[in-house]
Amino acid sequence: MTTHPPRTAAGRRAGHPPRAAGRGGRDATVLAVEAALLGAAVAVGALLDRRGVDLHADAAPLYASWRPHVGWGTVPALLVAAAVVRYGPGLARRAPWPRLLAGGYLAALAWTLSLALVDGWSAGFAERLTVQAEYLHEVPGVRDVPAMLAGFTGRILDFQPDSWSTHTSGHPPGALLLFVALDRVGLGGGTAAALACVLAGATVSVSVPAALRALGREAAARAALPFLVLLPGAVWVGASADGIFAAVLAAGLALLARPGRRAALPAGLLLGLALHLSYGLVLAGVLALTVVALRPADRRDGWADRWRVLALAGAGVAAVTGAFVAAGFWWLDGYHLVVERYYQGWAADRPYGYWIWANLAALLLCAGPAAGPALARALGPAVRRSAGRDPAVWLPVAAAVAVLAADLSGLSKAEVERIWLPFAVWLLAAVARLPAAHHRWWLAGQAATALVVNHLLWTVS
C-alpha cells in the first residue's frame, strides 16, 4: 500500500513548495520592473552627476567606479558559477543534510574568494580593509579596551582631533572590537581581517537554510541553499565587515529557530552582539519576532512556549547590552551621535529624492534578480493571509519590512549593497516559491549579476 504525505488546507503536500503553473508571466513582469528600476537608477544617477549633484558614487546606484577588468579570480568564479548552476539544484534536493551544508559552505567560500580575487590579491583582498576609512586604521591606537569603550561616544562626531574614522564612527564599538580581538590573538593586518570577513560571511549559506529547516520547511531550505551560495552580495562579503554582521545576525536567528529552549539564550547573545555591530540591525528585531512567532509549539503550551523563548533571548540581548553599558557605552547615546555624524559628511549632499528609490536598485544587485519575483510570490499569500506559518513567506516579508524602514529613515543613502547584506540574504528564503524547473535559470541570473558587477565596476573603496 502506497502512502502519501499529508496535504495542507491549500491542497498541496506538506513540506513542498506550492505549484507555480501559469505564473511565469508574472515573474517575467517583475523581472522587467527590476530591469527598469536599475536602468532608471543608472541613467538618473549619471544625469545628476553631469549636473553637478553630489551623489558621491561614481557608478550610482552602487558605491563604485566604472573600470572594466579581469583578474586571477575570473576563471575560478566562472567555474564555481557553472558548477553550482549545473549541479546545485539537484544536489540540494538529494544530498544528506550535513553534507549539503558542508558542501554549500565550501562552495560559498570558493565563490566569495574568487570574486574578491578578480580585483587582485592586494587590492581585492589583502589591502581592502587597510584604508583610512576602515576599522583596521584604528586598531593600533586601541591599547586599553576599557578606556576605548568608556570614551567611544566622545570621538564619534567629526572635526575633532581624535575623531574616529568613517566606519568606526558609524558603528557601535563591537565592530572595532572584533578586529582588535583578531589583532590581540596574533591575526592582525589586512589579510587576516579580510579572511575573517569571508570565512564568517559564507556561513549565511548554512544559517539561513538551517533556520528554514528548524521552522519546518526543509524543502524551502534546500531550494534556497544554492541561491545563497551564488549570492551576488558576495562581491561585498569579500571583503567587508558587513559580511561578519550578516553572519552574526543569521546565526542568531538560526539558533532562535531551533526547537526547544536551550538555544534561546545563546541566540539572544548573538543578537545582542549584532545590535552592537551595526545600529541598523535594530531593525532585525522584526526578523527575530517573526522567527519566534513561526516556531513550532506544543499544542498544550501554545504561545506560552514562545513567550519563554522570547524572554530567554531577550535576556541574552540584555546581557550583552548591559556589558557594554557597564564598560561605558550606551547604544542610544551612540545612535544619536551617529545620526549627527552622518549629516556631517556626504549624507548632507546626497539627495534623498534619488537615493530613496535608487537604493532599491542597489539592493537588487546585492540580492540578485531572483529576489524580486520570489518576494512577489511571497507577498501574495502574506496579503491574502493564506500563507499559514510558512517561513519562506514570512521571513522574506519581514526582511523587506526592515529594508523599507531603513530606506525611509534617510540614514542609508547609498552603499546599501553592503549595508543591507544582513537583510538581503533573508529575501532569498522566498526562492522556494519559484518554479523548481526554473531554478537553474534564476541561478544563472544570480551568478551573471555578480560577475558583471565585479568585472565592470571597481567596488574597492
Question: Where is each model-derived feature located?
Answer:
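Start-transfer (signal-anchor) and selected internal transmembrane alpha helices
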Residues: M1-L38, D54-V131, L312-A313
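Hydrophobic alpha-helical membrane-interfacial segments at the cytosolic entry of transmembrane helices
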Residues: V33-L37, L101-A108, P266-L271, D301-W330, ...
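Transmembrane-helix motifs of polytopic, lipid-linked glycan transferases
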Residues: A82-Y87, A192-L215, A223
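Hydrophobic, aromatic-rich transmembrane alpha-helices
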Residues: A82-Y87, L364-V393, A400-D407, A429-A430
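Specific aromatic-rich, kink-prone transmembrane helix
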Residues: S207, F245-A263, W426-A430
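Membrane-interface alpha helices of multi-pass inner-membrane proteins
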Residues: V229-G233, A251-L253, A263-T290, A319
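Short acidic/glycine- and proline-prone juxtamembrane loop motifs at membrane-interface regions
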Residues: G233-F245
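Perimembrane helix-loop-helix junctions
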Residues: L253-L265, V282-A315, R384-R385
